[in-house]
């Protein structure tokens, strides 16, 4: 049965972590694909989903239903913080923190690495390209 709740806006409409956890517990798809579902998370695009999972330390492959309450809380906080900062800086990516995965995920030559030298893997998850760091995201 489809969820009839309205889509959640990351800056103003995310439910409390416990409610978000109940919503995610109904989803068997990888968390990356769930975050890109616009009927659930309006406005969360590919780079925001990758960045939130990177900052939360969560593998994009993890089934949404398997996330712990602490992990759901980390994803929720990351989504809110990323969107709040992007809005604050009028989406001027040159003003985003240099530690963000965002700055390296767009490179298409050579071995991709984070600002800390960690390898970035690029693969398709849920029909979309995902950039993630296996040594940091579990």
Regions found by a protein language model. Give the residues of each.
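Short, local alpha-helical segments
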Residues: 34, 61-65, 97-100
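Accessory alpha-helical DNA-binding modules that contact the DNA backbone or grooves
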Residues: 25-29, 50, 54-87
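Phosphate/anion-contacting hairpin/loop surfaces
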Residues: 1-55, 75, 126, 133-134
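Acidic-enriched, low-complexity/disordered segments with a strong bias for Aspartate over Glutamate
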Residues: 3, 37, 50, 66, ...
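C-terminal accessory segment of soluble enzyme catalytic cores
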Residues: 83-138
